[in-house]
Amino acid sequence: MKQSHKTILLWALLIFLFVMIYNLISDGTSGEETLDTTEFKTLLQARIDERLADAGEGPALSDDRRALAQRAGEIASVTVEPNPNDNATYVLRYEGSGEDGLDPDKKTLVYGEYKGTIENLLTAAGISYEVKAKEESTFWQSLLISWLPMLLLFALFFFFMRQLQAGGGKAMSFGKSKARLLTDHQNKVTFKDVAGVEEAKDEVEEIIAFLKDPKKFTRLGGRIPKGVLMMGPPGTGKTLLARAIAGEAGVPFFSISGSDFVEMFVGVGASRVRDLFEQGKKNAPCIIFIDEIDAVGRHRGAGLGGGHDEREQTLNQLLVEMDGFESNDGVILIAATNRPDVLDPALLRPGRFDRRIIVPRPDLRGRTGILGVHTRKVPLSTEVALEVIARGTPGFSGADLESLVNEAALIAARRDKDRVDMEDFEDAKDKVMMGAERRSMIISDKEKRTTAYHEAGHALVAKLVGAETDPVHKVSIIPRGRALGVTQLLPTEDRLGFTREFALNKIAILMGGRLAEELVLKQKTTGAGDDIDKATDLARRMVTEWGMSDVIGPLNFASGGKQEVFLGRDLPQAEAYSQETAQRIDGEIRRIVTDQYERARRMLEENRDALERVARGLLEYETLDGNDIDTLCQGGRLSRPAVVSKPSADAESSVDEDEREARPALFPPLGKSGTDPEPEPA
């Protein structure tokens, strides 16, 4: 029963109990007074004497006697209990003498002929009455009425005791595992819904085959892996692969996040680990999936958190449960992380995580398969080629491709289309890769011109540096995200590594934007800040990590200060090289960046006309692709119409006063009704 239903039932019981208690207290006792027969007859006789005195047929009454008569006139009801030998019980109710429009002499006799003394006295007192027989109740009715309040009180007491016990259980349930047992009815995912990670699928399918037919593997002395660690960048499908395992395994599947172990109380994490594996043993064979295990499995050590903390205690218990003194046969632990470098070495040793599955970003064939999975429920135009889209999205993860398909469907719906076409996918790709357009942003002509030359410098240098670079895909001066302009380079194939020449060309391209501003506008702006940061970082890694400097040689000088303190490792030590070496490293970084800066300068100076044409093309069309830039560099013209840009900030501020006065007012002046009709547009 849901909590809301319990609350409604509780309130209903309380209301019913209060009504019963009120009826028992008020029934027959509210405003009633018990009189014996003698006293009652005295009151009625005083009432009779008062009536006779008022009619002039009797003596005047004393004050005490008149008070008794007045009291008799206030009688509301009379209950007459006859002799025990009489089987009838009579209830007499009077309506008042002449009140409420009733006849004072009205008499109603419902049960038999009862002409006793009380009736005669009531008649003489002028009280209109009604005689009814009291209904006799059965034994069960009497028992129910007498015991019902007690039963209700007992039920409420029992209910509150249960609530208190449940509350106490919740207070002591911090050590219980929060793992959720997945059922067949919860969004079942199979391996048909997973694409682009064929090797990883083969690895986990073998584990599922072992669970379904263990004798096939144990007959040769093999054993099932105790743990499987899935590693890969964010969005590559590690959790989706785990959900597919849950849908295919046919055994109990417990799912929990690494952050669900540690709470504010000491010892809770270790207790939850013990409870999790106890549940697994009871349901063996089963699978336990821990998502984001780096939250609890980080490297043990000093760091800034001390040598012992709650996370370390939880990790120790996890290590013992996975491969400790007691065996956990039939319990397979599957974990996922995108930070395998921070995991404790004891967690990664054989016997705990025997198998490590790499879930990389998909290649061309994998991206095509992922697009096919995500477009099953999307109506596509006949011109849509998923392989073409996959070729244009190198480096995209599965989550990126799902977002691309969703954005394309939303764009097509916004344009009132019945099917999604290639134009929608192209716009969606630009939105995912470069950010959403901010066309409503008003930019001055000066800022727009600066942005155009900046992006033209990037694009032109990318065209001139040679083949060892990514080709220009699109250049735009439409503000996207936090940038005023974007130059997008898109590789034609998956790039797993690059050469020294590629890195140098990358630095030259980054410097092209600042150089174009200097050559044409004779100024330096803050727009090149991000380019300079990326160029410096790339040059530093060339010198200190990749051994691409002839002066420094193939040595690594980056590991000394590279460790991150808050990952639980030891505090980073001082730099493992001398001040002289540090100066040589800094000088080599400066030389690499400066050389490429001068190289890009020569390219732009020798191709100044091409730079002007590309910049003018950006100002006219706002967005250019690689073919457009080739056409402009060769002196050609684009055949498509120019974009009609919105008024800039300068144009907005230079409106004539006469034109401003001629505009109709949006609101009427104060004190006027403003009922005149708006002027029709010319």
UniProtKB/Swiss-Prot annotation:
Active site per UniProt: E455
Parts of the chain on the Periplasmic side: 29-138
Keyword Amino-acid biosynthesis: no
Cofactor dependency: Zn(2+)
Membrane topology: Multi-pass membrane protein
SMART domains cross-referenced by the UniProt entry: AAA
Gene3D superfamilies given in the database record: 1.10.8.60, P-loop containing nucleotide triphosphate hydrolases, Peptidase M41
Keyword Metal-binding attached: yes
EC number: 3.4.24.-
Residue ranges, annotated region (Disordered): 638-682
Protein name: ATP-dependent zinc metalloprotease FtsH
